[in-house]
Amino acid sequence: MTSTLPNASTPDPSSLQPAVRPGAHGRFGRFGGQYVPETLMPALAELEQAAAQAWNDPAFTDELNRLLKNYVGRATPLYEAERLTAHYRRADGGPRIWLKREDLNHTGAHKINNALGQALLALRMGKKRIIAETGAGQHGVATATVCARFGLECVIYMGAEDMRRQALNVFRMRLLGATVQPVTAGTATLKDATSEAIRDWVTNVETTHYILGSVAGPHPYPMLVRDFHAVIGEESKQQCQEAFGRLPDVLMACVGGGSNAMGLFHPFVQDMSVRLIGVEAAGDGVASGRHAATITEGRAGVLHGAMSLLLQDGDGQVMEAHSISAGLDYPGVGPEHSYLREIGRAEYAAVTDQQALDALRLVSELEGIIPALETAHAFAWLEQLCPTLADGTEVVINCSGRGDKDVNTVAEKLGDQL
């Protein structure tokens, strides 16, 4: 069901322009909102209030920044990918490619930025039990990590199929003390894990905080997760000035739910000279029907508490998504991405499983960096993008995670033996 929010603006740490704040009903244009049971409305209001107070409390922001530096390892480097740049260079020049190295964070991906921030909020709210959903396992690992750090009970919901694909991350979560709860319903992937996590939250809302892992879900989650990840773009903006003396021309990131992309894009949304490109999973090809290209192929609908673009059949039922990447295997997307697409501020493309595999291998061989399969989707779009870019174009790709977790999947698909 839908509920309205008080007509009060929420203090925002990123000094946003009004055009990119969610409105009084938690909406980005027509997207977003709160489509949840009444049971959850007090918890969402409590979370929104706690976040607003926390961002205005120097003790909270100082602690967050201290942990981001000393525990997570920020700031992450902006790395010039010289051999990848040379690979795409033409006779008349070509773009210069930079990688924002989120793969170098503690736990190996961007997910720790949000998990850490929300864990601090949970402590502030007196919640001692944490639940989360995970697809590729990186958000689950990040959540289990911060729960271990702060002594919080941790339950991770993960689709049984994703547990098979990401067995290494399942072991990591358990090693960190988390309970990993298999979800066998539906396709046994991220959508189903999210649904089960929400059911748990409804039942245990008084004692439990749900650390949602993407810029999806009911308000205030899309804004909250975005703001904890905005450090990616804020650092990138400063690092670009230091590296080449101006803003980049193109920002690019993979998009499943969309948190790593929104973290990179958000501080640049008002800089209209900067192109924002999100890359989705085309799976076996969009025409095959087996894909997760939500923005490029979806229609507006409601899933997991918010209105956004979704993969739907002719009757409006949410369709099964497919991707070789467990982290992109989701039939929805964060509402702010849907909004940025609708107003023309961001562009979205889709690449197939095979294109992502080819890109993963290329980046590994040229740069000595094995990216996650999710991240490889962004790299794959360089094949189409680079021939269209003028000489000297500065391109920043968010290297959102490392590919250790995907080695077995890649070996299986490429026919290699480890």
From Swiss-Prot:
Which residues fall in a compositionally biased region of kind Polar residues? 1-17
The catalysed reaction is: (1S,2R)-1-C-(indol-3-yl)glycerol 3-phosphate + L-serine = D-glyceraldehyde 3-phosphate + L-tryptophan + H2O
Question: Is Lipid biosynthesis set as a keyword in this record?
Answer: no
Q: Which cofactor does it need?
A: pyridoxal 5'-phosphate
According to its UniProt record, the EC number is: 4.2.1.20
Q: What class of enzyme is it?
A: lyase
Record keyword Nucleotide-binding present = no
Q: What is this protein called?
A: Tryptophan synthase beta chain
The encoding gene is trpB
